[in-house]
Design a protein with these regions (language model features):
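Mid-chain, structured segments of secreted extracytoplasmic proteins
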Residues: 68-115
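Bacterial N-terminal signal peptides that target proteins for export
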Residues: 1-8
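Hydrophobic transmembrane signal anchors and adjacent membrane-proximal interface regions, especially
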Residues: 7, 29, 41, 57-58, ...
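Generic, low-specificity signal for short hydrophobic/alpha-helical stretches with a mild N-terminal bias
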Residues: 4, 60, 109-115, 128
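N-terminal small/polar-rich segments of proteins
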Residues: 21-87, 120-137, 141-143, 147-153
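N-terminal signal peptide c-region/cleavage motif recognized by signal peptidases
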Residues: 17-19
Length: 153
């Protein structure tokens, strides 16, 4: 019984000291935009053994502009997030000009794009993004709801 009380006390302390990821702050990236503004997915050739073989692919440039004015001088991590939706999974792979980190994520995931002290009121970069989907892509138009989250240290 005494052991059980210690376990309950330890769990209670763990809940009080929850990591910062438990409450990420969504950042305003409403000034970000894609070039071109609308992208059409293209069919990939059928090649057995390759992921997304026979699926769809598109390339887009994203001019990223994140409002960080409330966090200037604070240390933390910024993640790019792609929520899962009801349609087929999307894989996004990107390179950057250097302010943000290159990376990869799939629907329902988030990926680290910045670590350190927030340098100014905006965080800007340009991403070259490859989007891929399986052949079950079923829509002529679909809005992808990428966004950015900040976790403060």
């Amino acid at each position: 019984m005494k052991r059980c009380k210690h376990l309950i006390a330890a769990l209670g302390c763990a809940l009080l000291v929850m990591p910062s990821w438990a409450n990420p702050h969504r950042l305003d990236d409403s000034l970000s935009h894609t070039v071109p503004p609308n992208v059409e997915m293209q069919w990939l050739p059928l090649k057995s053994g390759q992921s997304f073989a026979g699926g769809m692919e598109a390339w887009v440039r994203v001019n990223v502009r994140i409002d960080t004015r409330n966090w200037v001088g604070r240390s933390g991590r910024i993640y790019m997030v792609l929520p899962r939706d009801q349609a087929s999974n999307i894989e996004a792979v990107w390179t950057t000009q250097g302010r943000l980190q290159a990376g990869r994520l799939v629907s329902g995931e988030r990926a680290l794009v910045f670590v350190g002290t927030v340098p100014g009121t905006t965080l800007e970069d340009q991403m070259q993004v490859r989007l891929r989907s399986n052949a079950d892509w079923s829509s002529n138009s679909r809005r992808l709801d990428f966004h950015f989250e900040l976790e403060i240290d």
